Amino acid sequence: MKRDILTITALLIMTVANAQEERRLITMEEAVLGTGIRTESRNYRWQEEGSTYTYSDESTIYVIDAKSGKTISETAVPKEEEQKEGPKPYAYSEKGNVYYTDQDGNAQAITSYNEPGIVCGETVSRNEFGISGGIFVSPDKRRIAFYKKDESKVTLFPLLDITSRTGTLQETRYPMNGMTSEIITLGVFDTETKETVWLDVTDFTEERYLTNITWNPAGDKIYIQVLDRNQKNMNLNVYSAIDGSFIKTLFSDSDSRYIEPQYPIYFMENNPEQFIYATNVRDGYWNLYLHNTDGKLIKRVTPVDADVEYLTQNGNYIYYYSAEVSPIDRHLFRTNIKSGKTERITKESGWHTCSLSPDGKYILDRYSAHNVPNNINILSADGKKSTNIFSAPDPTAELNFIPIEQGTIKSADGKYDNYYRLIKPLDFDPSKKYPVILYVYGGPH
């Protein structure tokens, strides 16, 4: 969002006086709606097995071998009348209740609440703390965990809907500071016994947050990062998915300012008795830590003074993003969980988004930078080989404006670099003084 605002601002600061004949000024409609200045992209995706990937244009779906770069097959994109609606997901929420699809393809209700303010199977806590869904299916699909949200005592807040011709008020329940919040519980439905159990969560007060729900690989336990409403204390608890009972607290994190859990735990594929835990409380930055299922800390996986984010794992390798190269870049690294040897995978400056092929041999790397609209490369798993498969043209090439500058300014104490982007008027004269608009993002992230 911030990048979009800065880009639009730069394009609006153009003047007709210095417009080069072969370039043009952006229109107000293009600036506001983003039409005509969008970066071209392609939706490359790995196939379910091996190291082949697909992408499509308006007429054709291509399947390509990552090793050779050769096209394996081409099929026509189905016509609109041939495109059928896909099947219902295995478990889903509809009108505030949870359903699953049985072996015969029929929808079966798990919950049947109709009280105002009771919602099941949907995201809770305003999508904070890494919460992005409300249904969690066990690895073997036998059990379905789901949030139940009771917001019946939460204050109704009016919002103006400007999409209607005259404008209408729509009410939503919003837990204001210091006022009653929603009450969250977690149910577990067994598709074999057709019974639901509720996890016995008793930490803190009932206005606690249940965050980052994680199944163990066997599908009989659930791990929850339970956070108090003051957001200063978090317990990583494990519960029985069979009867809902509390088993134990593995460990707790606390901070006098606030705690903000963001990620689930990640069980080791080659050792289900160990998992990766991410936190920024212990060493000042988001880092990864290896624990066993008794809660004991085995090692700090990423001992760097920078924020990192877990991506995936393959054998003994943990792949993760890191800001250690530059706080305005995101690079992919991997570390050997046994030896501790770490390798930087991506080399080009920019913001990288990567995915590992199912066979673990290749990486699909999408990245953009200050002067790179959108590049897509195929990398070897160790990053030593790189093949470019797509480079987007510059969407501003025909537009008349001065390129945005980047740089750093030292903090007042001289210890830290503050990064900036500088947007100058098209007729900028370095001998003159100009008023400056300084925009600072004041949020917590």
Q: What does each model-identified segment do?
A:
Residues 10-19:
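Hydrophobic h-region of N-terminal signal peptides that target proteins for export
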Residues 21-39, 194-201, 404:
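A short helix->beta-strand "capping" segment at the edge of beta-propeller domains
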Residues 59-64, 95-99, 153-159, 183-185, ...:
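Structural motif
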Residues 69-71, 110-135, 146-199, 384-394:
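Predominantly five- to eight-bladed beta-propeller fold
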Residues 38-54, 79-92, 117-143, 171-178, ...:
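Conserved beta-propeller blade repeats
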Residues 66-69, 102-105, 190-194, 241-243, ...:
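Short loop/turn segments that connect beta-strands within beta-propeller blades
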Residues 156, 219, 353-445:
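Serine-hydrolase catalytic core recognition
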